[in-house]
């Protein structure tokens, strides 16, 4: 009844929404890509453009600890995609996507049982929450067992609680007011 995914069906379309504290950040693949400036050329109010949003992209990137997968942790598929891009002359356009995941630059597949949760290094984030580093177990969409995924409950909501906010699961917010 009160799971962390809420499924909604709308005729020809169904959606999955995050239903726990942290919302949609609990069930996404952590991809954090900035829209390119040209994306705002049509269909957006004039006041909303890349220049206006850039400081917010930067702030969010810091809060979510956005980073790229270290080169020593690329999968064979990632290497093949890079080789393919190079082969067709588009190597300069190939990039791994920025993700809201904390990677350990020393993690590698050569160690015994590399995907073991025991290889995750714990650390305390700026909001005082204990997290781990990614061990590439592949459970990003389902919930990271080592808390390397930087979900909103570990950063923005934790910062709000640290500032005195009261986070109440299973409640609907109707208004927000200063006290």
Label the model's feature ranges:
Residues 1-72:
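Redox-cofactor-proximal catalytic regions of oxidoreductases
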Residues 50-173:
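Conserved redox-cofactor binding core of oxidoreductases
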Residues 175-179:
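Conserved beta-strand-loop-beta-strand element in the redox core of flavoprotein oxidoreductases
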